[in-house]
Amino acid sequence: MTTKTMKPLVEPHRLNRIWGRRAVIGVPMAFLLLVFLVPFLVVFKISVSEMDGVSFRDVVTWAEGAIHFHIKFDNYLGLAQDALYFQTYLSSLGFAALTTSICLLLAYPFAYFLARSPADKRPALLMLVMLPFWTSFLLRVYAWKMLLADAGVFNTLAMAAGLIAEPIKMMNTPFSMVLGMVYTYLPFMILPLYSNLVKMDLRLLEAALDLGATPWQAFWRITVPLSRSGIAAGSMLVFIPCVGEFVIPELLGGPETLMIGRVLWDEFFSNNDWPMAATVAVVMVLLIIVPMALFSKSRAEARA
C-alpha cells in the first residue's frame, strides 16, 4: 500500500515572497502614516481644543469615574461665517489653478521636445531642468524681487531702450506672484510629462499617419490621451503646494494676493490664535484631498 504525500496549500518560498512583499510595502506605509497622519491628528486636536492660558486643554479627560470630552467646533463655525476666509480659499485655489495651467502650457512642449530628442542629448537637457534645484529656493525667489523691482533689471533695460518712460509696477502684484510660482514649480510639471512621453510607443503615431491622420490629429488623438497620467501627476505636484504657498506670496505678492499660507502665518504668529490657525489648516488639507482623490480615480481609469 502506498501513501501520497500531501503538498502544502502554499509553498514556503511563495509564502516568503508574499510576506516579503507586504513588508516592503508596509514599512513605507507605516512611515507615511507616522509622519503625515499623526501630525494631522495633532493639528485637528488643536483646532477643536480650548485654550487654557498659554496651553491647550485636553480633549479627553477622566474625572469622577467617567470620560469627559472637551471638544469645540466654534472655530469651524466662525470660519464658515467669515467671508474673508472663504475669499482666501477661493483666491488660493484660483491662483493655484492658474499657475498649474500656465505650467502645463509651458511644460508640455518642452517635455515633448525633450522626449523626442536624441538619447545622447537628453541628460544635458534634463540637467538644465534640474539646475534651479542646485541653489536655495529662497535665493531664487528673492532674485525675482531684484528683477521685478521699480529700479530692477527689467524696468532699467526697458527705460534705457526707450520702451517705457517710467517704471512699470510689477512687484507686489498678482502677476509677480504667479510668475514666481510658475518659475518655481515648472520643473515639477516637466519631469512627469517627460517620464510619460519618453515611454510612448512611436509606432502608434506612425500607424495613425499611415491611415491618413495629420500630425496635428495624431497629436491630439494619440499623444495627448496617452500622456494623461503624466498631465495628472504634474498637475498635482504643482497645484497642491501652490495652494498653501507662503514664501512666494510674502516676497513677491501684495495686498491683492490673498493666499491661505499667509493667513495661516498671521493666525499662528501675529494673532497667536493657534486653534483658529489649526482650523484653517485642517480645512485646507480637506480641500487638497479632493483633487488628490480625482487624481487617484484618473489613474485607476487609465490602468483599467
Segments (PLM) and residue ranges:
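N-terminal signal-anchor/first transmembrane alpha helix
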Residues: T3-I46, F113, P123, M127
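Transmembrane alpha-helices
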Residues: V27, M127, L131, Y183, ...
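Membrane-interfacial helix termini and adjacent extracytoplasmic/periplasmic loops
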Residues: V10, D58-H68, V141-V182, W216, ...
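Glycine-rich helix-loop "coupling/hinge" segments at transmembrane-helix boundaries
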Residues: F246-N272
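Transmembrane-helix boundary motif in ABC transporter permease subunits
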Residues: K7-N16, F95-M130, L204-L205, F219, ...
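Short membrane-interfacial helix/loop motifs at transmembrane-helix boundaries
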Residues: L37-A83, A151-G152, G254-P255, A304
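C-terminal transmembrane helix and the adjacent membrane-cytosol boundary/short C-terminal tail
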Residues: T3-P8, P12, Y194-L209, P275-A304
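Membrane-embedded alpha-helices of multi-pass transport/permease systems
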Residues: L37-V48, L105-P109, L138-Y142, N155, ...
